Amino acid sequence: QGVLKAGQLGHGTPIGSHYTPDAPGYVDMTAVNAHDPERARALLKEAGVKLPLSLSLTVPPPPYARQAAQVVMAQLAKVGIQCRVQQVEWAQWLEGTYRNHDYDLSIISHVEPLDLGNFTKPDYYWGYRSPRFDALYRQLVTAVNEKERLDLLAQVQKLLAEDCVLAWLYQPHWVSVARKSLAGLWDDMPMLVNDLRSMRWVS
């Protein structure tokens, strides 16, 4: 909630896997890796991590990333992880973080819809490799029965959460402000654009 408040002024829904709450088949996975500093310290000890651990947190220009980074840095410090926030421009983020995988931590909003296929690409910038996920995803994209597809979606979300591939934070709510006489605005935004063809002024 602290990250959501800092990054989006509270306008968002916490998520625990790589799927949005408004999509068919969504399963709430926020409890799988809930905020728990005590458990985090125990896991670090179990993994044999020597504290304090120093990491860099690379963030692109948008305010959601740079403001949230301060909260993430403070929260990690409580479990013995010292973060140095590195603010970069988009070109640097794309070249260093995305293309060359040169980063410890980063904060980014994934806006591409239904991009679960990226988890089948071991060379993608988060470097996830899972034969089990690959098999589930192949079944998912070829499923024709809706019940089977929803069941596979649930399994995929659960596996990603349990594997801790990413630390999912929230699905942002994009707030639009318009005159009362403007009709045709989308109630839900499948992408970050406004379809001007559907808009019109009404009396």
Question: Each PLM stretch: what is its role?
Answer:
Residues 55-56, 84-98, 174:
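Acidic/histidine-enriched alpha-helical segments
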Residues 51-61, 83-86, 104:
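Short, well-ordered beta-strand elements
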Residues 1-27, 63-73, 94-203:
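Detector for C-terminal structural segments
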Residues 37-56:
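Immediate post-signal peptide segment of exported/extracytoplasmic ligand-binding proteins
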Residues 37, 90-91, 154:
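Structural motif corresponding to alpha-helix initiation and N-cap regions
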Residues 29-35:
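DNA breakage-rejoining catalytic core of tyrosine-based enzymes
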Residues 80:
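Short glycine-rich hinge loops at helix-strand junctions in the catalytic core
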